[in-house]
Amino acid sequence: MERDGEQAGQGPRHGPAGNGRELESPAAASLLAPMDLGEEPLEKAERARTAKDPNTYKVLSLVLSVCVLTTILGCIFGLKPSCAKEVKSCKGRCFERTFSNCRCDAACVSLGNCCLDFQETCVEPTHIWTCNKFRCGEKRLSRFVCSCADDCKAHNDCCINYSSVCQEKKSWVEEACETIDAPQCPAEFESPPTLLFSLDGFRAEYLHTWGGLLPVISKLKNCGTYTKNMRPVYPTKTFPNHYSIVTGLYPESHGIIDNKMYDPKMNASFSLKSKEKFNPLWYKGQPIWVTANHQEVRSGTYFWPGSDVEIDGILPDIYKVYNGSVPFEERILAVLEWLQLPSYERPHFYTLYLEEPDSSGHSHGPVSSEVIKALQKVDHIVGMLMDGLKDLGLDKCLNLILISDHGMEQGSCKKYVYLNKYLGDVNNVKVVYGPAARLRPTEVPETYYSFNYEALAKNLSCRETNQHFRPYLKHFLPKRLHFAKNDRIEPLTFYLDPQWQLALNPSERKYCGSGFHGSDNLFSNMQALFIGYGPAFKHGAEVDSFENIEVYNLMCDLLGLIPAPNNESHGSLNHLLKKPIYTPSHPKEESFLSQCPIKSVSSDLGCTCDPSIVPIMDFEKQFNLTTDAVEDVYSMTVPNGRPRNLQKQHRVCLLHQQQFLTGYSLDLLMPLWTSYTFLSNDQFSTDDFSNCLYQDLRIPLSPMHKCSYYKSTSKLSYGFLTPPRLNRVSRQIYSEALLTSNIVPMYQSFQVIWQYLHDTVLRRYAQERNGVNVVSGPVFDFDYDGRYDSSEILKQNTRVIRSQENLIPTHFFIVLTSCKQLSESPLKCTALESSAFLLPHRPDNIESCTHGKQESAWVEELLALHRARVTDVELITGLSFYQDRQESVSELLRLKTHLPIFSQED
């Protein structure tokens, strides 16, 4: 750096620096020569006589004036040449103490004499990470965060957009979309790296609405693989979702069930601002950087929940302890620097995390100018990344996953529920407030498990008309939420309507009128962002929505890793990739089918059937079907293949009827499933089939098969899996559906839901979808883990009713399958669509607050709340569907894991 006051092509300063003295000019020296003190005495005397002449004084005065003027001009033009040449700009003069009519050093601010461009030229480059035309060709200064000097390439300190701004090359966003048929990587990269980049709180709708203001993200969307909605996990909070993305696990499985939580066994509380956040005991499962470490693949994380914690004793190879004050640009540059490390140090997997637009959404709400500014900011940051990758030759090499953890909702102080309004004294309870609130006693851990949560739930149920919250014992929550099997989830939880939140009292919550998240993961405003871009992803593809737990396996495939056990369906995202890496296969059936020949003796069931119903006169003739008849039954009842049983050592036999097929459990003495097809022109009769059963001689007779067994029980009865009221060919179908092999124990309160489902919903589906195939059956999930129960758990939960052991289902499932093409029959679809439900089987309908409501309203609401993935049904029943289909297994997994979102109007 040159000295102060000097510029290229200028002479040195005149006079000793700092003493205020300056050397005489040659002109002044010659004029002062007659006054030299070294003259002889006679000459002095002569001069003295001459000086008495008045004209002499005038001449001397004139000479002295000229000398002074010459000296001043010499100072101006000889000593300060820089002032005349450049006095208006700081370019090339930043922080140098040059003295002119404007200055460019730090003191100019207090003196008030800065050049007009001081801020833009000298100050902004200390914290701005981009070039502009004015900065091009600037002088390099160490205090600038990046350089726009002409030699910045040689010094490797250029701002990321230097090439596009100063060399007039196209930026990444200015280039046209290009199909990347194969990775185009620098020689030092053996395979494409993967970068997982999170924009916290980026609601999916933001891109739908403001995409025109987000050129970089919009280009990634248009050139890569994109889904309009990626489904977060519940609760839709930051830590649970980020950790689910990198583990493939639901919060109940990986342990991070909220941003704030209490563990009764550890007797410790977790929050984002506490030291407990760094305690590895909170983190279960295996995040992808640990998976990578186990398989000798390096990783680098610039922030990610859990990445600064020693999980399983392992940290990423390069990581940063979270610090929200680090500028976004610095994070981008760091990752770009990591990508330039030697191969033996360079990570193969990377994460990046930005707090926006979540922070602005919380402060100002999702529909605000501040959020739009935040979106434009993160779009600019993503653009920096893409330009940086382009400069490194990695823009056609690296696989980028641009993702968010959840959406954002507008809060309102008028849409907050306070429990003290209903409970009065609330000193003995504590509530984790928000849209997914939870309650526990204050005395913990002593009373955590013994507290009477059930009584409190009943007390808070149906207190008001159109109540906006529902108290749930956690095992009654919709199974699709997967939010029960963890002690950190309090036994009493609250489900809130869209836009609503709950707290103990007003003083407990922080704010109410700004943005929030945490609600049901099917609400449209909770949906998240997903874009995949790079050589592995399809070009310009838009895919159906999927859940973020599926991303872990996808990343493992991109990195060549074997995934750790997780909750995902490996291969369900194969349709995002040009060349899928993993090929899934159907699970093998674990229990072979047993025989159920006709061997029972007819007995009196204590039933009274309507005389109009045609009874079964010759059981063997009617149900001992020929091979051709069996094939006809298969094609009509299970056109997509019969469900396979994945439960080990479970005796099941197939029972063929003319109009439906049954998988009957000889261990449970009830059907595991029945399957039939409801065609668009089928009708339901209005006949009464109560108190009418026919004995199925192919199965052992049980007291629970008799009408007399249920006559003295006020709440428990039986229900039919295949509805007897379905009218197709003749009255003979009635007697088939009235067989004892078609009934299950069912609460009378639930029969209302079950009948509406068959009489109304199935009929509507059949008419709208040109027919529908139906598979339904009981569910047993007493340990509420979303998996089918073992025989030991079933035995522990068997109830004795009227001296008879009875196993009452916890839920009932129903899977509806139709054709994607409405012109096709469900008996022969080229492509499928499916819907599924897991309905809680309870002795009352308190969940729905039925008083004063139309049956159609509350049942439809209940069905919507308890919809599920087909995969959820498979996990909880031990069944596997669609195994006879011709589609690839990955395509079937795509179908099974799909779940439509709720619009805000639903």
UniProtKB/Swiss-Prot annotation:
Pfam families: Endonuclease_NS, Phosphodiest, Somatomedin_B. AMP binds at D200, T238, N259, K277, Y322, D358, H406, H517. Residues 635-906 are annotated as: Nuclease-like domain. It catalyses: Hydrolytically removes 5'-nucleotides successively from the 3'-hydroxy termini of 3'-hydroxy-terminated oligonucleotides; a ribonucleoside 5'-triphosphate + H2O = a ribonucleoside 5'-phosphate + diphosphate + H(+); ATP + H2O = AMP + diphosphate + H(+); UTP + H2O = UMP + diphosphate + H(+). At low concentrations of ATP, a phosphorylated intermediate is formed which inhibits further hydrolysis. The secreted form is produced through cleavage at Lys-85 by intracellular processing. CMP binds at T238, N259, K277, Y322, D358, H406, H517. GO terms for biological process: 3'-phosphoadenosine 5'-phosphosulfate metabolic process; adipose tissue development; adult locomotory behavior; adult walking behavior; aorta development; apoptotic process involved in development; artery development; articular cartilage development. Zn(2+) 1 binds at D200, T238, D405, H406. Glycans are attached at N161, N267, N323, N459, N567, N624. Residues 173-573 are annotated as: Phosphodiesterase. The record marks K896 as: Essential for catalytic activity. 2',3'-cGAMP binds at H362, S514. The modification Phosphoserine is found at S25. Keywords: Biomineralization, Calcium, Cell membrane, Disulfide bond, Glycoprotein, Hydrolase, Membrane, Metal-binding, Phosphoprotein, Repeat, Secreted, Signal-anchor, Transmembrane, Transmembrane helix, Zinc. DTMP binds at T238, N259, Y322, D358, H406, H517. Disulfide bonds join C90-C104, C94-C122, C102-C115, C108-C114, C131-C148, C136-C166, C146-C159, C152-C158, C177-C223, C185-C397, C413-C512, C462-C849, C596-C653, C607-C707, C609-C692, C819-C829. Changing A457T: In strain: Lewis. Its cofactor is Zn(2+). The di-leucine motif is required for basolateral targeting in polarized epithelial cells, and for targeting to matrix vesicles derived from mineralizing cells. The nuclease-like domain is most probably catalytically inactive as residues that are essential for catalysis in the DNA/RNA non-specific endonucleases are not conserved. However, it is required for the stability of the protein and the catalytic activity born by the phosphodiesterase domain. Nucleotide pyrophosphatase that generates diphosphate (PPi) and functions in bone mineralization and soft tissue calcification by regulating pyrophosphate levels. PPi inhibits bone mineralization and soft tissue calcification by binding to nascent hydroxyapatite crystals, thereby preventing further growth of these crystals. Preferentially hydrolyzes ATP, but can also hydrolyze other nucleoside 5' triphosphates such as GTP, CTP and UTP to their corresponding monophosphates with release of pyrophosphate, as well as diadenosine polyphosphates, and also 3',5'-cAMP to AMP. This is Ectonucleotide pyrophosphatase/phosphodiesterase family member 1. The gene is Enpp1.
